[in-house]
């Protein structure tokens, strides 16, 4: 039986195309067909803004900075009967303050030609708006991680009296059971679990409340904790998978400390740029693996919450385009260094 003599309705002037491997060989047969686009935008996975909501945040109006008072412990002593109590038992006072200053206005902007918006088969403006908002969110999270790291590495005592010493940050350095060439994933996971426990104990020794403590790890190290013999082992956590499970790919707590994952725990060294008003942003997290912290370790000032501005009127007419601007005004800084511990390698 003879092959069919097909009328290829996608050809231009009846020519083009060949029966061969590859899309290019078929293009001639499909030249007149409509090039459809998917309604679903294939965008990058959104990074989670993990640190927001886990640190102290304050709104500010009518000012450029906010002072947080630092008070220390008071001492107690026996009273000798008959002697006058003059209030000098805790004299001189031991007070200080930390001042957080707003940085310059932070923006993420994009200008889109109106003609392009009309021709696009997908909601281009909505996607651009989302990406601009995410740019601000990611910068918020990255800066917060650097400030927590700065708190953990802060070795300056804020107060003078001996009773108030020790209010500085802490670090835990992972050993050969993590860094060794022969270290297994299970051994590395156990090392991280032990380090998280050490971090919690270090804060408890400084009278840091155990509530509101969080631990954030990078993706690699969060996955290593899953391979630990203790994090999700039923011998340590009871049955029922109440602390997560290997199948779910999640661990809820280690020694009572909730675990979270963020891509911002490890960062290259940051150099201050024009607009930064806090030298503590300049940190090198390239060897950092985890941050264990109480919410009081740092503060965030917010003068202007993330918002979107869209141009209209004369600007659009003269340029035949639309300008989209996402903006926020904030400042960050260390508050209580004793409330932060950084876990990393040497």
Give, region by region, the residue ranges found by the protein language model.
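Residue-level signal for secondary-structure boundary elements
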Residues: 53, 140, 144, 156, ...
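Internal, well-folded beta-alpha domain core
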Residues: 151, 157-161, 210, 215-227, ...
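Structured, hydrophobic secondary-structure cores that serve as assembly/anchoring elements
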Residues: 62, 67, 97-124, 194-228
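Surface-exposed polar/charged interaction patches
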Residues: 12-15, 150, 202, 206
């Amino acid at each position: 039986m003879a092959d069919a003599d097909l009328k290829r309705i996608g050809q231009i002037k009846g020519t083009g195309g060949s029966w061969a491997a590859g899309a290019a060989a078929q293009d001639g047969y499909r030249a007149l067909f409509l090039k459809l686009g998917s309604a679903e935008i294939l965008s990058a996975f959104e990074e989670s803004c993990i640190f927001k909501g886990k640190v102290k945040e304050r709104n500010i109006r009518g000012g450029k900075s906010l002072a947080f008072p630092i008070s220390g412990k008071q001492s107690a002593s026996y009273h000798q009967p008959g002697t006058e109590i003059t209030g000098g038992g805790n004299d001189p006072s031991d007070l200080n303050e930390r001042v957080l200053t707003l940085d310059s206005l932070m923006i993420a902007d994009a200008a889109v030609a109106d003609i392009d918006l009309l021709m696009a088969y997908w909601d281009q403006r909505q996607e651009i708006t989302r990406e601009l908002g995410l740019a601000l969110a990611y910068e918020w999270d990255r800066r917060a991680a650097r400030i927590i790291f700065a708190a953990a590495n802060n070795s300056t005592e804020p107060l003078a009296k001996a009773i108030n010493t020790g209010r500085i940050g802490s670090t835990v350095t992972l050993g050969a059971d993590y860094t060794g060439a022969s270290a297994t994933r299970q051994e590395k996971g156990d090392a991280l679990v032990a380090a998280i426990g050490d971090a919690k104990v270090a804060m408890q020794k400084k009278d840091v409340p155990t509530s509101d403590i969080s631990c954030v790890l990078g993706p690699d190290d969060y996955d290593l904790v899953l391979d630990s013999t203790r994090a999700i082992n039923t011998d340590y956590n009871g049955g029922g998978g109440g602390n997560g499970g290997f199948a779910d790919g999640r661990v809820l707590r280690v020694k009572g400390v909730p675990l979270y994952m963020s891509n911002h725990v490890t960062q290259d060294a940051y150099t201050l740029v024009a607009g930064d008003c806090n030298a503590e942003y300049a940190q090198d997290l390239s060897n950092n693996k985890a941050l264990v912290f109480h919410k009081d370790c740092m503060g965030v000032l917010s003068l202007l919450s993330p918002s979107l501005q869209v141009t209209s009127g004369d600007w659009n007419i003269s340029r035949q385009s639309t300008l989209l601007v996402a903006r926020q005004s904030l400042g960050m800084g260390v508050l209580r260094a004793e409330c932060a511990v950084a876990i990393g390698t040497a």
